[in-house]
């Protein structure tokens, strides 16, 4: 976008005038990462490292009831959780997971993260299809081409989840899911997103009425890659701010 002229060049004088605190707090090496052809185009998202592996927020109290005393720590644990919740609370819920047709991308990437040392090139590749490994970051490969046996196992697991009744039968065509809001009020058993969303869902806020209607309710989080310790911080340009070149 910067190359094609979509973003406004942010001069040092402009940043010092209109964003003085940001200018002072961002180190020079971070400004360098926000440059194209020597000009700054972005204000970085670098106030703190974001460890934002995606995963599932879930009812920790129900997981403990299912015998998972430490909560969900793997995809296998998650399957155990789903089976228990379906059998025990299925009639009280709208769905276990009111998923929609956009979730497949994060799901398969999460499976790969949990079952390999793959590290996607954040911010560059669509669908996290290309990256390196924790042992060899700079040799680029695609697990979609090399880890085919693992992906067959993932497909088998999704078939099992379908048979359990984890998601709606029209999941691939569903475009109107409000799963996160449904989790807040106790209508579903999980929400798939990342850790910053979990910090909201586990909080006793006015919108999270789940904790008012059930005093035992707790929300845990299983992040993709937890089994292997495969978690990385986001690039500081992931949520960086740019200004439209058409701004005046």
Per-region residue spans from a language model:
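Extracytoplasmic/secretory soluble proteins
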Residues: 1-248
């Amino acid at each position: 976008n910067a190359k094609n002229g979509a973003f406004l060049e942010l001069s040092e004088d402009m940043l010092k005038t209109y964003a003085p605190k940001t200018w002072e707090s961002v180190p020079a090496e971070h400004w360098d990462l926000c440059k194209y052809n020597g000009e700054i185009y972005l204000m970085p998202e670098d106030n703190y490292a974001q460890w934002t592996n995606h995963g599932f927020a879930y009812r920790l109290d129900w997981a403990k009831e299912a015998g998972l005393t430490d909560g969900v720590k793997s995809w296998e644990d998650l399957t155990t959780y789903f089976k228990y919740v379906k059998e025990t609370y299925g009639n009280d819920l709208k769905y276990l997971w009111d998923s929609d047709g956009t979730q497949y991308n994060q799901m398969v990437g999460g499976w790969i993260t949990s079952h390999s040392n793959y590290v996607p090139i954040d911010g560059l590749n669509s669908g996290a299809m290309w990256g390196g490994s924790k042992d060899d970051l700079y040799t680029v490969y695609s697990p979609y081409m090399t880890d085919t046996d693992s992906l067959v196992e993932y497909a088998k697991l999704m078939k099992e989840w379908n048979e359990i009744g984890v998601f709606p039968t029209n999941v691939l065509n569903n475009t109107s899911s409000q799963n996160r809001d449904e989790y807040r009020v106790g209508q579903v058993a999980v929400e798939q997103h990342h850790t910053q969303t979990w910090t909201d869902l586990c909080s006793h806020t006015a919108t999270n009425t789940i904790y008012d209607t059930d005093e035992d309710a707790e929300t845990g989080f299983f992040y993709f890659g937890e089994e292997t310790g495969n978690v990385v911080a986001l690039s500081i340009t992931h949520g960086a701010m740019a200004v439209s070149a058409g701004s005046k």
